Amino acid sequence: RQRQMCIRDRLQPSQVRDSQLCTTLELGDRRLSTVEHLLAALAGCGLTHVHLEVDGGEVPLLDGSAQGWVEAIAEVGITPAGTPAASRPVLEGPVTLHRGNSVITATPAEQFTLVGMIDFPQAAIGRQQWTVALTPERFVAEIAPARTFGFREQVEQLRAAGLIQGGALDNALVCDGDHWVNPPLRFPDEPVRHKLLDLIGDLALVGFPRAQVLVYRGSHGLHTDLAAALADRSAVQL
């Protein structure tokens, strides 16, 4: 029987323990994986004070997007918090980080704006770019429904290793070269939108900065590197 995990303390980038395929946090003596879509939904909808209880060590993936969490939030509603939200990071100047041929840059700006760029050899994806000045309304309508995506060869490898049992097509878009195995897409540029969904969830660990964040070939590792840099008081004003 799995224990229930209660999360009452403020989350922070220093709790990240793994960011290879998803974002995994260390919470006391336990770890919680695949937190990014839930955190994106909470932060994207404007929630600042939330008490979470989780059974097991993984947040449910649902359909691979944040849509289910957004719908659940809308069902219960949002009420004003009794205490003020934490201050948002204010950059002193540009912050640029690299991982291999991937790069993320945060530049001071009045409004939190995201620019995502991806470039894949698979023709079904190719090069995509999308920009959004983030508001709760735009998050709900234009970002939350975007699903995670993967590639047919990855699914076959995972099945051969006995790691998944036929559920991949229910919680991810699967690309096979020049086509999608399980269409239709919710947006023509759904992959790059999902990359920004992941970025929002990872930056929720520190709070949305007053900045424009541009990311090329983003990953959870790169995103959480930026979150850690934003949490460094020598780089930003809090």
Residue ranges of model-derived segments:
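C-terminal regulatory domains involved in ligand/effector binding and gene-expression control
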Residues: 1-4, 8-49, 53-238
